[in-house]
Amino acid sequence: MRFPLFAALAGSMFATAASAQEVTLRAVTSFAEGTQFSKNFERFIQKVNADGKGVVQINYIGGPRAMPPFEVGNAVRTKVIDIANVTGAFYTNLMPEADALKLIGKPADAQRKDGTFALIEQLHAQKLNAHYLARQFHNVPFHIYMNKKIDKLDFTGLKIRVTPVYKDVVEALGGTTVTTAPGEVYTALERGVVDGYGWPITGIFDLGWEKVTKFRLEPAFYSVEVGVLVNMDVWKSLTDAQKKVLNDAALWLEGLDSENEALIKAERDKQTAAGIAPIDLGPAASKEFLTKANEVGWASVIKRSPENGAKLRQLSGN
């Protein structure tokens, strides 16, 4: 097993009681600890543990060193863990509709008001046995990064590391897709196993990928989605007071997205300083790219889940 720590946890109760009133939930993140897409979750844990003394606490087990990223969704489903920081791209095998989350760029509060969040919650309950507690990073876009410069919108001959987020658009542009865990990307780039990769605008410096990256294709596209999931059996077992601590912290966590605009600007400047050059193919190609990315993204979701995919697209407005 690649995560022996969790083999020991799998047979235990969902949460340990410190007292008659307090429960402790076990948490993992699907991204490396202390990196861009784990940091806010770690702040969330600190807030819960500060505000929830005597009510609810979170025991932070860690990241991919404890559990492979693509196992996290199933670990929530089967109650191996209680709460997780994970992107839907890592559990589309269990919930195909999770691939639509990248196409819904509205703020979380807007999604809560217009019914989008309710449908996403319903789908997680049905297919992942999970409560969808929070969504982060709606205003952080993705890019395709490359080590070979292109002069037209054609990926023929290029091997691009993907998750389900980028797979359809890379293939639509003629590229060959390669799937690896984030921890394997550096070596794949260094050895020429892949010519590029998809990743958000933020976070590559956490992983050292700037050392093996030459170009960033413009424009940015899609929206990052990192959710906080709670096993549904665990969620139902919590008291109203325990749920309130988690719900309040979840809304606070979603509010941290206001920090992202400054982070994105700083990241672009940092990439420029590191020698990562933008590839701008011009307005027509940029429009074609964005249109294709949106259309193939939705087509893939609707093909795998016709009814729910259509509902999600209608709610998304795009």
Where are these regions (language model features)?
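Sec/Tat signal peptide C-region and signal peptidase I cleavage site
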Residues: 14-20
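Signature of the catalytic double-stranded beta-helix
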Residues: 113-126
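N-terminal secretory/targeting leader peptides
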Residues: 21-110, 125-318
